[in-house]
């Protein structure tokens, strides 16, 4: 981690955009936790959107539950952006008083591609990619499919962590869309084979000024860490059990499942009391 910080400036003050690519059970969330552990004292606030939180209770161990959501809704991201605008203004004003306010925050979108058409085309998502660093917002996006991010947004990614992938088609997609610094696809596959065993990862650093391959590509393995907590202590003071918006939503009732404009169901009672 120290080498990546030194060589690639993975620093909370730089508010990097980080993408983690890997199929299920390759350690994406574990890697995100490892990265956050290394900057645990840097962020007073944050936002987590993870569809599996109600099942695995992963992020609530180190992020206040009030900051975690398991259903992507554009309004949540928009409100977070507004929060960062206000924090940035407060920071600029606080410098004059000598009591500097810390505006930094993190945002995690954990496997949100179930709502891909919704979030990737949403204006607030594009704003985070294009301008998040200007609002002191570090963003970590985990995803299983390499093309989950459109080309115009990929150019704003600072770090790409590539985890184990044995499907040749997906390897080629990763190579063509994220790893063009490798002279050949075969060389890229050799690096992947060497760097992604045992939950290790291949790291591509896009914000270096060098064109040398050794300055842009690294190996990294996430570590297990003792319990820790992110965010300002005031956010933990009244921390309560996580409430799932996904489980509370009544999306599976008969009315919502009925096809649009379909005629209502009609029950016909037959002689003898049966239904047809």
PLM segments and residue spans:
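Conserved P-loop NTPase motor module
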Residues: 1-18, 197-276
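Conserved P-loop NTPase motor cores
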Residues: 4-8, 15-44, 51-55, 74-186
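Intrinsically disordered, low-complexity eukaryotic regions enriched in glycine, serine
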Residues: 10, 49, 66-68
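P-loop/Walker A phosphate-binding loop and immediately adjacent motor/lid segment at beta-alpha junctions
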Residues: 172-210
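Active-site regions of enzymes building and remodeling cell-envelope glycoconjugates
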Residues: 60-73
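General N-terminal targeting signals
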Residues: 63-65, 157, 177-179, 191, ...
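Short acidic, gly/pro-rich beta-turn/loop elements at beta-sheet edges
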Residues: 56-58, 213
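Short, conserved catalytic or adaptor-binding loops enriched in Gly and charged residues
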Residues: 59-62, 153, 194
């Amino acid at each position: 981690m120290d080498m990546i910080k030194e060589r690639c400036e993975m620093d909370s003050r730089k508010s990097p955009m980080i993408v983690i690519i890997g199929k299920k059970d390759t350690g994406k969330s574990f890697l995100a936790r490892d990265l956050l552990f290394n900057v645990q004292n840097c962020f007073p606030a944050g936002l987590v959107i993870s569809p599996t939180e109600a099942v695995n209770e992963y992020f609530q161990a180190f992020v206040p539950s009030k900051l975690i959501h398991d259903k992507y809704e554009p309004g949540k991201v928009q409100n977070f952006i507004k929060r960062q605008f206000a924090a940035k203004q407060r920071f600029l004003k606080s410098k004059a008083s000598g009591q500097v306010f810390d505006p930094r925050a993190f945002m995690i979108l954990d496997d949100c591609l179930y709502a891909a058409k919704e979030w990737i085309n949403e204006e607030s998502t594009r704003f985070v990619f294009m301008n998040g660093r200007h609002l002191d917002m570090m963003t970590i996006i985990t995803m299983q499919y390499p093309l989950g991010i459109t080309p115009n947004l990929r150019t704003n990614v600072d770090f790409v962590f590539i985890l184990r992938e044995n499907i040749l088609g997906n390897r080629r997609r990763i190579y063509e869309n994220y790893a063009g610094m490798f002279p050949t696809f075969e060389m890229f596959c050799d690096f992947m084979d060497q760097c992604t065993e045992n939950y290790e990862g291949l790291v591509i650093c896009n914000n270096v000024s060098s064109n040398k391959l050794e300055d842009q590509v690294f190996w990294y393995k996430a570590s297990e860490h003792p319990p820790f907590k992110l965010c300002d202590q005031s956010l933990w003071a009244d921390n309560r059990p996580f409430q799932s918006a996904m489980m509370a939503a009544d999306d599976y009732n008969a009315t919502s499942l009925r096809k649009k404009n379909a005629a209502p169901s009609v029950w016909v009672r037959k002689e003898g009391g049966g239904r047809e």
